[in-house]
Curated annotation (Swiss-Prot):
Places the protein is found: Nucleus; Cytoplasm, Cytoskeleton, Microtubule organizing center, Spindle pole body
Name of the protein this chain belongs to: G2/mitotic-specific cyclin cig2
Gene3D superfamilies recorded: Cyclin-like
PTM comment, free text: Phosphorylated.
Oligomeric and partner information: Associates with cdc2, res2 and rum1. Interacts with pop1 only when phosphorylated.
One of the Pfam families matching this protein, by short name: Cyclin_C
Biological source species: Schizosaccharomyces pombe (strain 972 / ATCC 24843) (Fission yeast)
Region (Interaction with pop1) location: 181-273
Recorded name of the encoding gene: cig2
Major subcellular site: nucleus
UniProt region (Disordered), positions on chain: 57-89
Disulfide bonds: none
Sorted UniProt keywords: Cell cycle, Cell division, Conjugation, Cyclin, Cytoplasm, Cytoskeleton, Mitosis, Nucleus, Phosphoprotein
Protein backbone atom coordinates (compact mmCIF):
# COMPACT_ATOMS: atom_id res chain seq x y z
CA UNK A 1 0.00 0.00 0.00
CA UNK A 2 1.41 3.35 -0.95
CA UNK A 3 2.36 5.64 1.87
CA UNK A 4 0.92 8.80 0.39
CA UNK A 5 -1.91 9.23 -2.11
CA UNK A 6 -0.79 12.16 -4.21
CA UNK A 7 -1.70 13.16 -7.73
CA UNK A 8 1.09 15.18 -9.28
CA UNK A 9 -0.11 18.39 -10.94
CA UNK A 10 0.46 18.86 -14.62
CA UNK A 11 3.48 20.94 -15.45
CA UNK A 12 5.05 20.48 -12.05
CA UNK A 13 8.55 19.84 -13.34
CA UNK A 14 11.11 21.90 -11.47
CA UNK A 15 12.87 24.62 -13.41
CA UNK A 16 16.40 24.63 -12.02
CA UNK A 17 16.89 28.28 -12.96
CA UNK A 18 13.74 29.60 -11.33
CA UNK A 19 13.98 29.39 -7.57
CA UNK A 20 15.95 31.25 -4.96
CA UNK A 21 16.75 31.50 -1.26
CA UNK A 22 19.73 32.01 0.99
CA UNK A 23 21.10 28.59 0.06
CA UNK A 24 20.65 28.69 -3.73
CA UNK A 25 22.58 25.79 -5.20
CA UNK A 26 21.68 25.81 -8.89
CA UNK A 27 21.22 28.21 -11.80
CA UNK A 28 23.61 29.76 -14.28
CA UNK A 29 22.04 33.21 -14.42
CA UNK A 30 22.13 35.79 -11.66
CA UNK A 31 18.77 35.80 -9.92
CA UNK A 32 16.71 38.95 -10.11
CA UNK A 33 15.94 38.95 -6.39
CA UNK A 34 17.92 38.32 -3.23
CA UNK A 35 21.37 39.55 -2.32
CA UNK A 36 24.58 38.69 -4.11
CA UNK A 37 26.27 37.68 -0.87
CA UNK A 38 23.90 34.78 -0.30
CA UNK A 39 24.46 33.09 -3.65
CA UNK A 40 26.81 30.18 -4.13
CA UNK A 41 28.97 29.56 -7.16
CA UNK A 42 27.18 27.86 -10.04
CA UNK A 43 30.17 25.53 -10.36
CA UNK A 44 28.79 23.78 -7.30
CA UNK A 45 26.06 22.11 -9.33
CA UNK A 46 28.59 19.81 -10.98
CA UNK A 47 28.78 17.63 -7.88
CA UNK A 48 25.15 17.81 -6.81
CA UNK A 49 23.72 14.37 -5.90
CA UNK A 50 20.61 15.01 -7.99
CA UNK A 51 19.02 11.68 -8.87
CA UNK A 52 16.25 9.25 -8.16
CA UNK A 53 17.60 6.73 -5.69
CA UNK A 54 16.41 3.13 -5.38
CA UNK A 55 14.95 3.18 -8.89
CA UNK A 56 17.20 0.28 -9.86
CA UNK A 57 15.86 -2.00 -7.12
CA UNK A 58 12.17 -1.43 -7.81
CA UNK A 59 11.67 -5.11 -8.58
CA UNK A 60 13.43 -6.39 -5.48
CA UNK A 61 10.97 -8.36 -3.40
CA UNK A 62 10.95 -8.42 0.38
CA UNK A 63 11.89 -12.07 0.49
CA UNK A 64 14.66 -11.80 -2.10
CA UNK A 65 16.74 -9.05 -0.58
CA UNK A 66 20.04 -10.88 -0.46
CA UNK A 67 23.32 -9.75 -1.93
CA UNK A 68 22.49 -11.09 -5.38
CA UNK A 69 19.16 -9.24 -5.59
CA UNK A 70 20.63 -5.93 -4.53
CA UNK A 71 23.78 -6.12 -6.65
CA UNK A 72 22.44 -3.50 -9.07
CA UNK A 73 21.70 -1.17 -6.19
CA UNK A 74 25.37 -0.90 -5.23
CA UNK A 75 27.07 2.04 -6.82
CA UNK A 76 30.58 1.67 -8.14
CA UNK A 77 33.38 2.57 -5.78
CA UNK A 78 36.98 3.32 -6.58
CA UNK A 79 39.18 1.74 -3.92
CA UNK A 80 42.33 3.32 -5.31
CA UNK A 81 42.66 5.41 -2.16
CA UNK A 82 43.00 2.30 -0.05
CA UNK A 83 46.16 0.33 0.44
CA UNK A 84 46.72 -2.73 -1.70
CA UNK A 85 47.82 -6.07 -0.32
CA UNK A 86 51.41 -5.08 -0.91
CA UNK A 87 50.91 -1.82 0.96
CA UNK A 88 49.27 -3.56 3.87
CA UNK A 89 52.65 -4.53 5.25
CA UNK A 90 53.71 -0.91 5.58
CA UNK A 91 53.09 0.83 8.91
CA UNK A 92 49.87 2.79 8.67
CA UNK A 93 51.12 5.31 11.20
CA UNK A 94 53.88 6.50 8.85
CA UNK A 95 51.36 7.67 6.23
CA UNK A 96 49.17 9.75 8.49
CA UNK A 97 51.37 10.53 11.48
CA UNK A 98 51.10 14.24 10.68
CA UNK A 99 47.34 14.02 10.84
CA UNK A 100 46.53 11.29 13.36
CA UNK A 101 49.18 10.40 15.90
CA UNK A 102 49.16 6.79 17.08
CA UNK A 103 51.01 6.35 20.34
CA UNK A 104 53.10 3.28 21.08
CA UNK A 105 51.32 0.34 22.63
CA UNK A 106 52.75 0.87 26.12
CA UNK A 107 52.40 4.65 26.12
CA UNK A 108 50.21 6.36 28.69
CA UNK A 109 49.84 9.90 27.36
CA UNK A 110 48.90 12.57 29.84
CA UNK A 111 46.32 15.25 29.24
CA UNK A 112 49.12 17.77 28.76
CA UNK A 113 50.61 15.65 25.99
CA UNK A 114 47.27 15.34 24.23
CA UNK A 115 46.76 19.09 24.40
CA UNK A 116 49.95 19.56 22.38
CA UNK A 117 48.62 17.24 19.69
CA UNK A 118 45.43 19.18 19.13
CA UNK A 119 44.56 20.19 15.59
CA UNK A 120 42.18 22.73 14.14
CA UNK A 121 38.62 21.43 14.36
CA UNK A 122 35.13 22.82 14.02
CA UNK A 123 34.34 21.75 17.59
CA UNK A 124 37.31 23.40 19.29
CA UNK A 125 35.22 26.19 20.77
CA UNK A 126 33.08 23.96 22.95
CA UNK A 127 32.83 26.61 25.62
CA UNK A 128 30.16 28.37 23.54
CA UNK A 129 27.93 25.28 23.61
CA UNK A 130 25.13 25.81 26.17
CA UNK A 131 24.97 22.06 26.82
CA UNK A 132 28.53 22.20 28.16
CA UNK A 133 27.77 24.93 30.71
CA UNK A 134 29.32 23.73 33.94
CA UNK A 135 26.49 25.01 36.13
CA UNK A 136 23.76 23.10 34.29
CA UNK A 137 25.57 20.22 32.56
CA UNK A 138 24.60 17.46 35.07
CA UNK A 139 20.88 18.22 34.82
CA UNK A 140 21.04 18.71 31.06
CA UNK A 141 22.76 15.40 30.39
CA UNK A 142 20.49 13.54 32.78
CA UNK A 143 17.56 14.83 30.74
CA UNK A 144 19.00 14.01 27.31
CA UNK A 145 19.93 10.49 28.43
CA UNK A 146 16.29 9.88 29.32
CA UNK A 147 15.30 11.44 26.01
CA UNK A 148 17.78 9.14 24.28
CA UNK A 149 15.87 6.07 25.42
CA UNK A 150 12.55 7.64 24.48
CA UNK A 151 13.67 8.31 20.89
CA UNK A 152 14.84 4.77 20.15
CA UNK A 153 13.21 3.33 17.00
CA UNK A 154 12.07 -0.26 16.76
CA UNK A 155 15.28 -2.12 15.81
CA UNK A 156 13.20 -4.69 13.90
CA UNK A 157 10.89 -2.29 12.10
CA UNK A 158 11.98 -3.64 8.73
CA UNK A 159 10.09 -6.86 9.49
CA UNK A 160 6.81 -4.98 9.02
CA UNK A 161 7.90 -3.34 5.77
CA UNK A 162 6.69 -5.35 2.78
CA UNK A 163 8.80 -3.67 0.09
CA UNK A 164 11.82 -2.30 1.96
CA UNK A 165 15.05 -3.89 3.14
CA UNK A 166 17.99 -2.82 5.28
CA UNK A 167 20.08 -2.49 2.14
CA UNK A 168 17.64 0.10 0.83
CA UNK A 169 18.00 2.02 4.09
CA UNK A 170 21.76 2.13 3.51
CA UNK A 171 21.30 3.42 -0.05
CA UNK A 172 18.84 6.10 1.06
CA UNK A 173 21.03 7.25 3.95
CA UNK A 174 24.10 7.46 1.72
CA UNK A 175 22.16 9.71 -0.65
CA UNK A 176 21.15 11.86 2.32
CA UNK A 177 24.80 12.10 3.36
CA UNK A 178 25.62 13.50 -0.09
CA UNK A 179 22.83 16.07 0.04
CA UNK A 180 23.69 16.98 3.61
CA UNK A 181 27.32 17.61 2.65
CA UNK A 182 26.46 19.61 -0.47
CA UNK A 183 23.99 21.79 1.43
CA UNK A 184 26.60 22.34 4.18
CA UNK A 185 24.10 21.50 6.90
CA UNK A 186 24.83 21.00 10.58
CA UNK A 187 25.88 17.47 11.65
CA UNK A 188 22.91 17.34 14.03
CA UNK A 189 20.57 17.77 11.06
CA UNK A 190 21.67 14.50 9.47
CA UNK A 191 21.24 12.47 12.65
CA UNK A 192 17.82 13.96 13.32
CA UNK A 193 16.70 13.22 9.75
CA UNK A 194 17.71 9.56 10.02
CA UNK A 195 16.03 9.28 13.42
CA UNK A 196 12.83 10.74 11.95
CA UNK A 197 12.92 8.15 9.17
CA UNK A 198 13.54 5.26 11.55
CA UNK A 199 10.87 6.33 14.03
CA UNK A 200 8.37 6.96 11.25
CA UNK A 201 8.97 3.54 9.69
CA UNK A 202 8.61 1.99 13.14
CA UNK A 203 4.99 3.18 13.11
CA UNK A 204 3.95 3.07 9.46
CA UNK A 205 4.56 0.93 6.40
CA UNK A 206 6.10 2.59 3.37
CA UNK A 207 6.18 1.57 -0.26
CA UNK A 208 9.44 1.58 -2.18
CA UNK A 209 8.13 4.25 -4.53
CA UNK A 210 7.66 6.63 -1.59
CA UNK A 211 10.85 5.73 0.30
CA UNK A 212 12.91 8.50 -1.28
CA UNK A 213 10.10 10.95 -0.55
CA UNK A 214 10.23 9.90 3.09
CA UNK A 215 13.98 10.51 3.18
CA UNK A 216 14.02 13.94 1.54
CA UNK A 217 11.05 15.07 3.64
CA UNK A 218 12.77 13.96 6.84
CA UNK A 219 15.86 15.96 5.86
CA UNK A 220 13.68 19.01 5.20
CA UNK A 221 11.99 18.68 8.59
CA UNK A 222 15.33 18.24 10.35
CA UNK A 223 16.73 21.28 8.55
CA UNK A 224 13.83 23.43 9.68
CA UNK A 225 14.39 22.24 13.24
CA UNK A 226 18.19 22.54 13.43
CA UNK A 227 19.37 25.09 10.88
CA UNK A 228 19.54 28.86 11.25
CA UNK A 229 19.03 29.28 7.49
CA UNK A 230 17.23 26.29 6.03
CA UNK A 231 17.43 25.55 2.29
CA UNK A 232 14.13 26.09 0.51
CA UNK A 233 11.80 23.22 -0.25
CA UNK A 234 12.59 23.71 -3.95
CA UNK A 235 16.21 22.86 -3.24
CA UNK A 236 15.22 19.55 -1.69
CA UNK A 237 12.73 18.74 -4.45
CA UNK A 238 15.35 19.47 -7.11
CA UNK A 239 17.61 16.80 -5.61
CA UNK A 240 15.03 14.11 -6.39
CA UNK A 241 15.53 14.78 -10.12
CA UNK A 242 11.84 15.32 -10.80
CA UNK A 243 10.65 12.24 -8.93
CA UNK A 244 8.51 14.38 -6.61
CA UNK A 245 6.98 17.85 -6.52
CA UNK A 246 6.77 20.55 -3.90
CA UNK A 247 3.19 19.49 -3.22
CA UNK A 248 4.33 15.89 -2.67
CA UNK A 249 6.86 16.97 -0.06
CA UNK A 250 4.37 19.27 1.70
CA UNK A 251 1.79 16.49 1.97
CA UNK A 252 4.44 14.04 3.17
CA UNK A 253 5.71 16.56 5.72
CA UNK A 254 2.28 17.01 7.27
CA UNK A 255 1.66 13.28 7.33
CA UNK A 256 5.02 12.37 8.90
CA UNK A 257 4.75 15.06 11.57
CA UNK A 258 1.28 13.84 12.50
CA UNK A 259 2.52 10.25 12.79
CA UNK A 260 5.32 11.46 15.09
CA UNK A 261 2.89 13.67 17.03
CA UNK A 262 5.13 16.60 16.10
CA UNK A 263 7.72 15.28 18.54
CA UNK A 264 11.15 16.06 17.08
CA UNK A 265 13.05 15.85 20.35
CA UNK A 266 16.28 14.00 19.76
CA UNK A 267 19.65 14.07 21.58
CA UNK A 268 22.40 14.26 19.00
CA UNK A 269 25.26 11.78 19.57
CA UNK A 270 27.63 14.71 19.13
CA UNK A 271 26.51 16.03 22.51
CA UNK A 272 27.73 12.84 24.14
CA UNK A 273 30.94 12.88 22.09
CA UNK A 274 31.72 16.40 23.26
CA UNK A 275 31.07 15.47 26.88
CA UNK A 276 33.56 12.60 26.71
CA UNK A 277 36.01 14.74 24.77
CA UNK A 278 35.87 17.31 27.55
CA UNK A 279 36.81 14.63 30.08
CA UNK A 280 39.83 13.49 28.07
CA UNK A 281 41.22 16.99 27.53
CA UNK A 282 39.63 17.94 24.20
CA UNK A 283 41.75 15.66 22.02
CA UNK A 284 40.46 16.66 18.58
CA UNK A 285 41.97 13.57 16.95
CA UNK A 286 40.05 11.01 18.99
CA UNK A 287 36.92 13.15 18.68
CA UNK A 288 37.23 13.26 14.89
CA UNK A 289 37.60 9.49 14.72
CA UNK A 290 34.71 9.24 17.15
CA UNK A 291 32.50 11.24 14.79
CA UNK A 292 33.39 8.95 11.91
CA UNK A 293 32.74 5.78 13.89
CA UNK A 294 29.46 7.12 15.26
CA UNK A 295 28.17 7.81 11.76
CA UNK A 296 28.41 4.08 10.97
CA UNK A 297 25.03 4.03 12.72
CA UNK A 298 23.52 5.27 9.46
CA UNK A 299 24.59 2.16 7.57
CA UNK A 300 24.68 -0.72 10.07
CA UNK A 301 21.22 -1.59 11.35
CA UNK A 302 22.72 -3.73 14.11
CA UNK A 303 23.36 -0.46 15.96
CA UNK A 304 19.69 0.54 15.99
CA UNK A 305 19.03 -1.31 19.23
CA UNK A 306 21.52 0.80 21.19
CA UNK A 307 20.92 4.31 22.54
CA UNK A 308 22.99 7.03 20.90
CA UNK A 309 24.76 7.78 24.18
CA UNK A 310 26.16 4.25 24.21
CA UNK A 311 27.09 4.35 20.51
CA UNK A 312 28.93 7.63 21.03
CA UNK A 313 30.74 6.22 24.06
CA UNK A 314 31.74 3.11 22.11
CA UNK A 315 32.97 5.26 19.23
CA UNK A 316 35.18 7.27 21.57
CA UNK A 317 36.37 4.10 23.27
CA UNK A 318 37.31 2.52 19.94
CA UNK A 319 38.98 5.68 18.63
CA UNK A 320 41.12 5.78 21.77
CA UNK A 321 42.03 2.14 21.26
CA UNK A 322 42.95 2.69 17.62
CA UNK A 323 45.09 5.70 18.50
CA UNK A 324 46.39 4.06 21.70
CA UNK A 325 45.36 6.93 23.90
CA UNK A 326 45.35 4.92 27.10
CA UNK A 327 42.74 2.99 29.10
CA UNK A 328 39.06 3.78 29.56
CA UNK A 329 39.45 5.61 32.86
CA UNK A 330 36.86 6.14 35.62
CA UNK A 331 36.65 9.78 34.55
CA UNK A 332 35.69 8.70 31.02
CA UNK A 333 33.19 6.22 32.44
CA UNK A 334 31.54 9.01 34.40
CA UNK A 335 31.48 11.42 31.46
CA UNK A 336 29.96 8.78 29.17
CA UNK A 337 27.02 8.24 31.49
CA UNK A 338 28.42 5.28 33.40
CA UNK A 339 29.33 2.96 30.54
CA UNK A 340 32.09 0.57 31.58
CA UNK A 341 34.58 -0.81 29.08
CA UNK A 342 32.99 -4.26 28.94
CA UNK A 343 29.64 -2.67 28.02
CA UNK A 344 31.14 -0.92 24.99
CA UNK A 345 33.07 -3.78 23.45
CA UNK A 346 30.07 -5.31 21.68
CA UNK A 347 29.37 -2.06 19.83
CA UNK A 348 33.06 -1.53 19.14
CA UNK A 349 33.18 -4.99 17.57
CA UNK A 350 30.27 -4.07 15.26
CA UNK A 351 32.17 -0.97 14.18
CA UNK A 352 35.29 -3.03 13.55
CA UNK A 353 33.33 -5.59 11.57
CA UNK A 354 31.95 -2.82 9.35
CA UNK A 355 35.51 -2.10 8.19
CA UNK A 356 36.22 -5.74 7.42
CA UNK A 357 33.40 -5.81 4.86
CA UNK A 358 33.78 -4.63 1.25
CA UNK A 359 33.50 -0.88 0.87
CA UNK A 360 30.26 0.25 -0.71
CA UNK A 361 29.28 3.57 0.88
CA UNK A 362 31.18 5.93 -1.37
CA UNK A 363 29.75 9.22 -0.11
CA UNK A 364 30.36 8.31 3.52
CA UNK A 365 33.93 7.21 2.83
CA UNK A 366 34.77 10.27 0.75
CA UNK A 367 33.26 12.64 3.29
CA UNK A 368 35.65 11.48 5.99
CA UNK A 369 38.62 11.09 3.65
CA UNK A 370 38.97 14.87 3.44
CA UNK A 371 41.58 16.90 5.30
CA UNK A 372 38.83 18.52 7.31
CA UNK A 373 38.17 15.16 8.97
CA UNK A 374 41.88 14.20 9.08
CA UNK A 375 41.32 11.49 6.44
CA UNK A 376 39.69 9.45 9.18
CA UNK A 377 37.96 6.94 6.89
CA UNK A 378 41.19 6.03 5.08
CA UNK A 379 43.09 5.82 8.34
CA UNK A 380 40.57 3.61 10.13
CA UNK A 381 40.01 1.28 7.17
CA UNK A 382 43.72 0.65 6.80
CA UNK A 383 44.42 0.37 10.51
CA UNK A 384 41.50 -1.92 11.29
CA UNK A 385 42.30 -4.26 8.40
CA UNK A 386 45.88 -4.48 9.63
CA UNK A 387 45.34 -4.72 13.34
CA UNK A 388 41.94 -6.37 13.67
CA UNK A 389 41.62 -8.64 10.63
CA UNK A 390 38.80 -11.17 10.94
CA UNK A 391 41.21 -13.90 9.85
CA UNK A 392 43.83 -12.97 12.39
CA UNK A 393 44.12 -14.95 15.62
CA UNK A 394 47.79 -14.64 16.54
CA UNK A 395 49.18 -12.23 19.10
CA UNK A 396 52.78 -12.35 17.92
CA UNK A 397 52.95 -8.94 16.27
CA UNK A 398 54.24 -6.61 18.94
CA UNK A 399 53.28 -3.59 16.85
CA UNK A 400 49.58 -4.32 17.12
CA UNK A 401 47.04 -5.54 19.60
CA UNK A 402 45.45 -9.01 19.44
CA UNK A 403 42.32 -9.32 17.35
CA UNK A 404 40.39 -10.45 20.41
CA UNK A 405 41.25 -7.41 22.50
CA UNK A 406 37.86 -5.81 21.93
CA UNK A 407 35.78 -8.91 22.46
CA UNK A 408 37.32 -10.24 25.66
CA UNK A 409 37.48 -8.64 29.07
CA UNK A 410 41.23 -9.02 29.23
CA UNK A 411 43.65 -6.45 27.84
Amino acid sequence: MALYSISKPVGSKINKHSYQDENTLVGKQALSKGTEKTKLSTNFEINLPRRTVLSDVSNVGKNNADEKDTKKAKRSFDESNLSTNEEADKPVESKFVKKLKVYSKNADPSVETLQKDRVSNVDDHLSSNPLMAEEYAPEIFEYIRKLDLKCLPNPKYMDQQKELTWKMREILNEWLVEIHSNFCLMPETLYLAVNIIDRFLSRRSCSLSKFQLTGITALLIASKYEEVMCPSIQNFVYMTDGAFTVEDVCVAERYMLNVLNFDLSYPSPLNFLRKISQAEGYDAQTRTLGKYLTEIYLFDHDLLRYPMSKIAAAAMYLSRRLLRRGPWTPKLVESSGGYEEHELKEIAYIMLHYHNKPLEHKAFFQKYSSKRFLKASIFVHQLVRQRYSVNRTDDDDLQSEPSSSLTNDGH
